[in-house]
């Protein structure tokens, strides 16, 4: 099968420099969603017709199985498909999709393709309560489709028809090539309509069939930021529904955003306002508190993430305790039962089982052993202005509050670092290491009297 995706439009009503088809739905370009759905049909040719912002569109969705055709002037849908003709195989039917209609399901497209087979003309239609602005499906007395009439060219009688054309069609490619060559632009829009091929097919006695989607939202197009927001909410609602059906507890299905792929084990609970980006896995019994942002991370069974945490490209071991207000940056790997508390940031560090940094700390470019306690205010000083250096903290270390570990430095097994220490050399195993000024009290000192300047 050939699949042609029309993605050349400017999208004036978006009021944006970004090409319309690159505006995101669930964190990915609309066009990427359409391409993903098209791939489920295993096409032999997948052609994207580009125009406005062509290079940006090409870069955004380039892949080995995608080819491009350029429409230099936007002269209508028929003209757009003409640009793809040199890349199509006449021995296979062609399915036409739209880069700004991102929610059409694979099941709906398969139903249309199966209805059309290799010899019929298939049209995806829907009935709308208010069909204003859409091309109407005109049928004869026997119920067969004879033509599609665009809104601006329709009579009052035709405008009363509620069945509309979604624009998605499939037909034999050889016929399509011939019909496109006969299109005229003598209409209210001055464009070459792809829909006019329906009338050509009817005139030649080609059987015209239709299929309908399971839901109206599958065919919603995006021409404005208002419509983009509507499509986003529908998509998120559908994703939330699937999570609920697999046993995930959502505090409010209307207040979760999944911008990628979220997989969950059993008895997972997600509070309100959470955003999941990229690939995220939540193991059995994981609890996610309110207003967390989690990106490209895995969280193992039994872990708890308290509210307002940011987790990016990290691995959290079983039974971990994160937050609230914690930040895990790329390269963070936490073992079993690791506690990372409020206002603690961990970056590019490996922390072994049962270790804790519960308050106000920065752990960057570090290797932390098991059963380590990192006191409040501890900082790994990992950057000298040009290069990053690692800190190594071995098992069973206790680090007192307000400690600076100036990398590269190692704290050996079982060592204790006194509060307020600035550590610049290796701390030996099982010993107390500290560096601080000797405390003094000046008995004769009096606080000076200070007067405000007049």
Curated annotation (Swiss-Prot):
Pfam family, one: Hexapep
GO biological process terms held by the UniProt record: cell morphogenesis; cell wall organization; lipid A biosynthetic process; peptidoglycan biosynthetic process; regulation of cell shape; UDP-N-acetylglucosamine biosynthetic process
Residues that hold acetyl-CoA according to the record: 376, 382-383, 401, 419, 436
Pathway: Nucleotide-sugar biosynthesis; UDP-N-acetyl-alpha-D-glucosamine biosynthesis; N-acetyl-alpha-D-glucosamine 1-phosphate from alpha-D-glucosamine 6-phosphate (route II): step 2/2; Nucleotide-sugar biosynthesis; UDP-N-acetyl-alpha-D-glucosamine biosynthesis; UDP-N-acetyl-alpha-D-glucosamine from N-acetyl-alpha-D-glucosamine 1-phosphate: step 1/1; Bacterial outer membrane biogenesis; LPS lipid A biosynthesis
Residues annotated to bind Mg(2+): 100, 223
GO molecular function: glucosamine-1-phosphate N-acetyltransferase activity; magnesium ion binding; UDP-N-acetylglucosamine diphosphorylase activity
Region feature Pyrophosphorylase, mapped onto this chain: 1-225
Binding site residues for UDP-N-acetyl-alpha-D-glucosamine: 6-9, 20, 71, 76-77, 98-100, 135, 150, 165, 223, 329, 347, 362, 373
A cellular component annotation (GO) from this entry: cytoplasm
Primary enzyme class: transferase
Reactions accelerated catalytically: alpha-D-glucosamine 1-phosphate + acetyl-CoA = N-acetyl-alpha-D-glucosamine 1-phosphate + CoA + H(+); N-acetyl-alpha-D-glucosamine 1-phosphate + UTP + H(+) = UDP-N-acetyl-alpha-D-glucosamine + diphosphate
SUPFAM superfamilies with a match to the protein in the record: Nucleotide-diphospho-sugar transferases, Trimeric LpxA-like enzymes
Coarse class of the protein's main subcellular location: cytoplasm
Role noted for this protein: Catalyzes the last two sequential reactions in the de novo biosynthetic pathway for UDP-N-acetylglucosamine (UDP-GlcNAc). The C-terminal domain catalyzes the transfer of acetyl group from acetyl coenzyme A to glucosamine-1-phosphate (GlcN-1-P) to produce N-acetylglucosamine-1-phosphate (GlcNAc-1-P), which is converted into UDP-GlcNAc by the transfer of uridine 5-monophosphate (from uridine 5-triphosphate), a reaction catalyzed by the N-terminal domain.
Assembly mode: Homotrimer.
Family: In the N-terminal section; belongs to the N-acetylglucosamine-1-phosphate uridyltransferase family.
Name under which the protein is recorded: Bifunctional protein GlmU
Naturally occurring in which organism (per UniProt): Cupriavidus pinatubonensis (strain JMP 134 / LMG 1197)
Gene: glmU
